[in-house]
UniProtKB/Swiss-Prot annotation:
GO function term, MF aspect, one: proton-transporting ATP synthase activity, rotational mechanism
Localization per Swiss-Prot or TrEMBL: Cell inner membrane
Signal peptide annotation: none
Domain of life: Bacteria
Its biological purpose: Produces ATP from ADP in the presence of a proton gradient across the membrane.
Keywords, comma-separated and alphabetical: ATP synthesis, Cell inner membrane, Cell membrane, CF(1), Hydrogen ion transport, Ion transport, Membrane, Transport
Similarity annotation: Belongs to the ATPase epsilon chain family.
Pfam families referenced in this protein's UniProt entry, alphabetically: ATP-synt_DE, ATP-synt_DE_N
Name of the protein: ATP synthase epsilon chain
Membrane topology annotation: Peripheral membrane protein
Organism: Methylibium petroleiphilum (strain ATCC BAA-1232 / LMG 22953 / PM1)
Amino acid sequence: MATIHVDVVSAEASIFSGEAKFVALPGEMGELGIYPRHTPLITRIKPGAVRVERADNGEEEFVFVAGGILEVQPDRVTVLADTAIRGHDLDEAKAEEAKKAAEEAMKNAKSDIDFAKAQGEFAAMAAQIAALRKFRKK
């Protein structure tokens, strides 16, 4: 069976590297599904869950990404994430707290720049919570 090599990296570390049967993630224009021998592609990714179906045991790996860039080659997928957290390391309480703080920051923003920063943080935390709940269902 054909496989595709997947690397998920953040500024801090390599989060996942291995062979996969399938990768799904939130692209800028919608959900993307990538199989081996996919057409080359570069696109931005939105905050959300990256799902990797491992080739060795068929298990699914989940990684939350807070946006970034996706590069697809026929034999390789590279996710360059702004922030990436393994699914089992996500903390819903911290994410809820950060989401509330971002909501307050949006209410108290003194400039458009401050509002945009808070809005981005709010969207990232909402996506992280959604990814965590999706991960828990598996």
